[in-house]
């Protein structure tokens, strides 16, 4: 590792100290990411722009260390054209962790706020989102927080999904309070358990509707109102969905909702064509078991201009979630994090065992 790569500089960005290697210059604030501060920067090694996410004090508590470890593992594992790529990672002498990723010019939230999207852009953006999900879902990874602001887009209309830090194993006891409300699948609110990759399809369906219509399809004011606005379009939850509700309180709430009939999607989206409406209805099915999969959605006639089964890979192996049930002390997560970072930089962990943390964390590769 060169001296240049292993030396750090402190830079103040709008009152926040970024302690980065000298490889990164021209830091400019972008905003808050999931659990971290975001900056744009110039990578002196490549000459190109990058995004720097600072996760503050990940070793201050086991829950923070575990969450950061999960994000690191996922970024390393999920290598796909439509998922944001990890370019570099290091732990600063101040023990903050920095993720360096590709920098894309804008996100879908900003695009939708500025102007209506033309049909070919709606089609191409939807295709790329589903292409990413076809890759991650067989790996046992669910994003769980898909929304326009974490759909990144560059000037060539290349799309990449970011913020997989909240993603978790498809297990029967998935924790309940995740996705931004407008894009949250009804089964999350109804059961808080036993949900899977279908929640991502619902979220992308909501984004699809928003791209068509120019406004959120289900703008709930709170948890209760969210379910109400869903039933105003889709009608009352069907019996097969109600029967999955395990909470008595939730069951009583659903039973007390006014009985509603489904509204025609063609009436709700008068500017959409028949293929758009058909796919949208398949994505926004109340019953997650009947909701279309990413692979089947890619094969839908609406996406025929882009669909190519030979160029829509799935993950080769399932993501190893064995760490996720571990209840470890912070120091153990720290050791595991250093090991993952060394592995990312292709450093032989055994040969580096005598190195001190300050010399093993710099971003050199």
Swiss-Prot record:
Tell me the residues on which Phosphothreonine occurs. 175
Residues that, per the record, bind ATP? 30-38, 53
Q: What are the inducing conditions?
A: By hyperosmotic and hypo-osmotic stress. Less induced than isoform HOG1B under the same conditions.
Into which EC class is this enzyme placed?
transferase
Which Pfam family, any one of them, does this sequence belong to? Pkinase
Give the source's domain of life in one word: Eukaryota
Q: Which GO terms describe its cellular component?
A: cytoplasm; nucleus
Which molecular-function annotations from GO does this UniProt entry contain? ATP binding; MAP kinase activity; protein serine kinase activity
Protein kinase domain residues are 24-303
Q: Per the entry, what modulates this protein's activity?
A: Activated by tyrosine and threonine phosphorylation.
Q: Which UniProt keywords apply?
A: Activator, ATP-binding, Cytoplasm, Kinase, Nucleotide-binding, Nucleus, Phosphoprotein, Serine/threonine-protein kinase, Transcription, Transcription regulation, Transferase
Q: How is it modified after translation?
A: Phosphorylated. Dually phosphorylated on Thr-175 and Tyr-177, which activates the enzyme. Rapidly dephosphorylated upon either hypo- or hyperosmotic shock.
Q: Where is this motif: TXY?
A: 175-177
Q: Where is the active site?
A: 145 (proton acceptor)
The cofactor named in the record is: Mg(2+)
User: Known EC number(s)?
Assistant: 2.7.11.24
Sites of Phosphotyrosine modification: 177
What protein family does this chain belong to?
Belongs to the protein kinase superfamily. Ser/Thr protein kinase family. MAP kinase subfamily. HOG1 sub-subfamily.
Q: What is this protein called?
A: Mitogen-activated protein kinase HOG1A
- Species in which this protein is naturally found: Wallemia ichthyophaga (strain EXF-994 / CBS 113033)
Q: Which gene encodes it?
A: HOG1A
């Amino acid at each position: 590792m060169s001296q240049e790569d292993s030396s750090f500089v402190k830079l103040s960005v709008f009152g926040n100290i970024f302690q980065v290697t000298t490889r990164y210059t021209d830091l400019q604030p972008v905003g808050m990411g999931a659990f971290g501060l975001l900056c744009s920067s110039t990578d002196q090694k490549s000459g190109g722009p990058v995004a720097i996410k600072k996760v503050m004090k990940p070793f201050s508590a086991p829950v923070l260390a575990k969450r950061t470890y999960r994000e690191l593992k996922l970024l390393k594992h999920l290598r796909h054209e439509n998922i944001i790529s990890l370019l570099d990672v290091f732990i600063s002498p101040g023990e903050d962790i920095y993720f360096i990723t590709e920098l894309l010019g804008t996100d879908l939230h900003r695009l939708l706020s500025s102007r209506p999207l033309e049909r070919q852009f709606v089609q191409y953006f939807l295709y790329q989102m589903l292409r990413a999900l076809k890759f991650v879902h067989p790996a046992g990874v669910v994003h769980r927080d898909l929304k326009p602001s974490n759909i990144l887009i560059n000037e060539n209309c290349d799309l990449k999904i970011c913020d997989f830090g909240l993603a978790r194993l498809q297990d029967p006891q998935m924790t309940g309070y995740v996705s931004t409300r407008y894009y949250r699948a009804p089964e999350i609110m109804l059961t808080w358990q036993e949900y899977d990759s279908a929640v991502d399809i619902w979220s992308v369906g909501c984004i699809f509707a928003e791209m068509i219509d120019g406004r959120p399809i289900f703008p709930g004011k709170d948890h209760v109102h969210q379910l109400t606005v869903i039933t105003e379009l889709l009608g009352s939850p069907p019996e097969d969905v109600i029967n999955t509700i395990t909470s008595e309180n939730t069951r009583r709430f659903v039973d007390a909702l006014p009985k509603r009939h489904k509204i025609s999607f063609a009436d709700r989206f008068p500017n959409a064509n028949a293929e758009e409406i058909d796919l949208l209805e398949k994505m926004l099915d109340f019953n997650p078991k009947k909701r279309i999969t990413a692979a089947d959605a890619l094969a839908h006639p609406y996406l025929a201009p882009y669909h190519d089964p030979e160029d829509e890979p799935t993950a080769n192996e399932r993501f190893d979630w064995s760490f996720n049930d571990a209840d470890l002390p912070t120091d153990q997560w720290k050791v595991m994090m250093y090991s993952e970072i060394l592995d990312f930089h292709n450093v032989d962990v055994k040969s580096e065992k005598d190195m001190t943390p300050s010399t093993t964390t710099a971003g050199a590769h």
